[in-house]
Regions:
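Generic structural signal for secondary-structure transition and capping sites
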Residues: 20-23, 35-38, 68
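Residues that recognize and position ribonucleotide moieties
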Residues: 4-5, 40
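Enriched for short, Lys/Arg-rich terminal
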Residues: 2-4, 10-20, 54-56, 60-91
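A short, surface-exposed loop/turn module that caps and links secondary-structure elements
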Residues: 32-61
C-alpha cells in the first residue's frame, strides 16, 4: 500500500531532544520504514497498552537499543506519535 506520512507534536518535540547518533539511527530506520512500515528488520509490534488507551492500534518500531518510535495507521496515512525509550509506552 502507498502510505502518506505525518508526525504529531510529541514526536517532533522528542526527536529534537535525541543526540546526533540517535537522530542518524532514526533517519536510517525511516528509510526502511518509508518503503514498508512492517518490514521484518524494524520488528514492528503492537503496543496493546497504548492501543487501549488511545482507541487506535498503536505500533512501535525498533530503532536502536532502547530507542523506539510509535505510530498508528489511519486509512492510507501513517501517523508517527512519539519517539524515545520504552518510557513512551507509558502513555
Amino acid at each position: 500500500m502507498n502510505y502518506r506520512y505525518r508526525a504529531v507534536e510529541p514526536f517532533w518535540k522528542h526527536f529534537h531532544r535525541l543526540n546526533d547518533a540517535q537522530k542518524e539511527s532514526a533517519r536510517q530506520t525511516w528509510k526502511i520504514f518509508r518503503e514498508n512500515p512492517f518490514d521484518p528488520r524494524l520488528r514492528t509490534h503492537k503496543i496493546h497498552k497504548l492501543s487501549s488507551l488511545y482507541g487506535e492500534t498503536i505500533y512501535a518500531v525498533d530503532i536502536e537499543g532502547d530507542l523506539r518510535s510509535t505510530f498508528y495507521v489511519d486509512g492510507n496515512w501513517i501517523v508517527s506519535v512519539d519517539i524515545g525509550t520504552h518510557d513512551i509506552y507509558k502513555g
